[in-house]
A protein has these predicted regions:
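Glycine- and aromatic-enriched alpha-helical transmembrane segments of multi-pass membrane proteins
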Residues: 71-131
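Active-site HxH/HxHxD metal-binding segment of metal-dependent hydrolases
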Residues: 186, 190-223, 310
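Conserved beta-strand hairpin/beta-sheet module of binuclear metal-dependent hydrolase folds
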Residues: 32-35, 126-173, 181, 246-269
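Binuclear metal-ion centers of metallo-dependent hydrolases, dominated by the metallo-beta-lactamase
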Residues: 214-234, 241-247, 319-377
Length: 377
């Protein structure tokens, strides 16, 4: 239970009951028969048909039973715990509760549990924002949070198997951050790696508004701008809805405060980069740049990167991806301009927070650097 809260930010209420039912069935009705079947096969080479039928029947019942309870999302208790020590405290509390009743210290378990589950304050001050660049493999998903609002820029991919980045990555992190609704979701364009998991996201959280360039939602086009808690949001491209333009129809969003700015570029290619240089020369300047098109050779022209003049460039790409993003050519562009470059495939989730200190405009945290594991060495 503590491990489920740590990893997934929620706990299925039915989980203890399911374990009480499944473990005895597997222990007494399935595993002994399976071992007997293996022994018969090993010594005689013959497996009675009734044993195979029995094991198949039990397996089918087992998976149907688990699948039924897996669909009961509405009975999931969402209460994420924060960090390793909260996990340790919750595990300690669970162990104390299991002690014999005669042990006088059992009442301390509930106090320890309250401390472990006490929510941390994630509220930002006015005029500041936090950007979470999620590790969604070869795709993009960025959460922008202000004091009272949340925007999700792209949602990652969905695969034919049903596996999707909304359920695997985005929703668990939103629960961990105690985010119960999204004010706006922007689907930069309709490629699967940017918009594929939207249906799964919409089933898992309340979404107040969707902006896109595919004509199916409110239009994410030049001229749309708004302000949340002292943070300004400006759409810099496209000028109209051109779904057939694919990558070049990407919604380009600039997020800015008085001290820090972030430019989110989707999958724009060279043609749009040059147009932005010509028509938004001052607007595209930003402290932090989300590298266009995951670091493909189609984008990140030296002229565009020079015009943006970022102090740091963040790339969202999958480890060992088939496109070899970011390419050596793109990495050379940023290196030649002395712009530090970090990538989700190496850093995992990347968190950018505008700083409260006057001398520092922002701070960047890389999940894997802060949470090293021996198997990543």
């Amino acid at each position: 239970m503590p491990l489920s809260l740590l990893q997934f930010g929620s706990l299925k209420i039915w989980a203890p009951l399911v374990n009480l039912m499944v473990i005895p069935i597997m222990t007494f009705l399935y595993i002994p028969v399976l071992l007997l079947t293996l022994l018969l096969a090993g010594f005689s080479g013959y497996i009675p048909n009734f044993l195979v039928s029995y094991l198949t029947y039990i397996s089918q019942l087992f998976w149907e039973f688990l699948d039924y309870f897996a669909q009961l999302d509405h009975v999931a208790w969402g209460w994420p715990i924060h960090g390793f020590w909260s996990f340790v405290l919750l595990t300690l509390a669970a162990a104390i509760i299991l002690l014999p009743k005669a042990v006088p210290q059992r009442q301390w378990a509930f106090l320890i549990m309250i401390i472990a589950l006490w929510p941390s304050d994630q509220t930002l001050p006015k005029n500041h924002f936090r950007a979470e660049f999620f590790d969604v493999g070869q795709g993009t998903s960025v959460l922008i949070s202000t004091q009272n609002h949340h925007l999700l820029y792209d949602v990652g991919a969905r695969f034919p198997s049903g596996f999707n980045m909304a359920e695997a990555v985005i929703l668990p992190i939103l629960r961990q951050l105690h985010i119960e609704q999204l004010d706006t979701v922007i689907l930069s364009h309709d490629d699967n790696d940017h918009a594929g998991s939207y249906p799964d996201l919409a089933q898992g959280i309340v979404i107040n508004q969707v902006l896109s360039t595919d004509g199916l939602h409110q239009a994410c086009i030049v001229g749309r701008h708004w302000q949340w808690d002292g943070v300004r949001f400006d759409v810099l491209s496209p000028y109209n809805l051109y779904p057939n333009f694919k990558n070049n129809s990407s919604c380009v969003l600039k997020v800015s405060t008085a001290t820090t700015s972030l430019l989110l570029t989707g999958d724009i290619e060279q043609a749009v980069e040059y147009r932005l240089i010509q028509q938004h020369t001052d607007d595209i300047k930003a402290d932090v740049l989300l590298i266009p098109h995951h670091g493909s050779n189609t984008s990140s022209t030296p002229e565009f990167v020079t015009a943006v003049r970022p102090k740091i460039a963040i790339n969202s790409s999958g480890a060992y991806n088939q496109f070899k993003h970011p390419t050596e050519q793109v990495k050379a562009v940023y290196e030649n301009l002395n712009i530090p470059m970090i990538d989700t495939q190496n850093s995992g989730r990347i968190t950018l927070t505008t700083s409260l200190k006057a001398k520092a405009e922002y701070k960047v945290k890389q999940f894997r650097q802060q949470n090293p594991r021996f198997w990543r060495r």
